[in-house]
Swiss-Prot record:
Function: This is a 2S seed storage protein.
Keywords from the UniProt entry: Allergen, Disulfide bond, Seed storage protein, Storage protein
Identification of the protein by name: Allergen Sin a 1
Residues cleaved off as propeptide: 40-54
Similarity field: Belongs to the 2S seed storage albumins family.
GO molecular function: nutrient reservoir activity
Outcome (variant: residue 36 to G): In 1.0103/SA2S2
SMART domains named in the record: AAI
Effect of mutating residue 130 to P: In 1.0101, 1.0105/SIN2, 1.0106/SIN3, 1.0107/SIN4 and 1.0108/SIN5
Length: 145
C-alpha cells in the first residue's frame, strides 16, 4: 500500500512510538490556536543556534514540544518524516471530526489542516534532528481525501 509507510520498518516504529502521541497533541494544539502567541513553526521565529548554546534561555521549549522531540529522537532518521506524516494524518482526522461537529467546515478547516502540515514540516529542525531538517510534505492546500 502507498501512503507514508512505504518502508515497513517505519510503520513498526510508528506503532512502537505510540503514534508519536506527544507530537500529535502538539500539532493539534498548534493548529487550533491560530495566530496566538509564538507558533514555533515558522523559520524566522527564533534562532536555532542560540537555542543550542543556551538551553535555559527564553527559548525554552514547552514541555509538550520537548516530549515530541524526544519521541522523534528515538526514531531512525529514515523514519522521522514518514512517522511525522502518519501523526499529521491522524491529527487531520481528529480536527475534521471536531470542526465538523461545530459545523465549521470549509475554508477554516483547510486553514487548520495546512497549519498541521506546516508545523510538522519544521519539527525535525525545531528538535535539532541532525540528519533531517525539513520534511518534504506538500505545503499546498491538501485536496479532498
Amino acid at each position: 500500500p502507498a501512503g507514508p509507510f512505504r518502508i515497513p520498518k517505519c510503520r513498526k516504529e510508528f506503532q512502537q512510538a505510540q503514534h508519536l502521541r506527544a507530537c500529535q497533541q502538539w500539532l493539534h494544539k498548534q493548529a487550533m490556536q491560530s495566530g496566538s502567541g509564538p507558533s514555533w513553526t515558522l523559520d524566522d521565529e527564533f534562532d536555532f543556534e542560540d537555542d543550542m548554546e543556551n538551553p535555559q534561555g527564553p527559548q525554552q521549549r514547552p514541555p509538550l514540544l520537548q516530549q515530541c522531540c524526544n519521541e522523534l529522537h528515538q526514531e531512525e532518521p529514515l523514519c522521522v518524516c514518514p512517522t511525522l506524516k502518519g501523526a499529521s494524518k491522524a491529527v487531520k482526522q481528529q480536527v475534521r471530526q471536531q470542526l465538523g461537529q461545530q459545523g465549521q467546515q470549509g475554508p477554516h478547516l483547510q486553514h487548520v489542516i495546512s497549519r498541521i502540515y506546516q508545523t510538522a514540516t519544521h519539527l525535525p529542525k525545531v528538535c535539532n534532528i541532525r540528519q533531517v531538517s525539513v520534511c518534504p510534505f506538500k505545503k499546498t492546500m491538501p485536496g479532498p481525501s
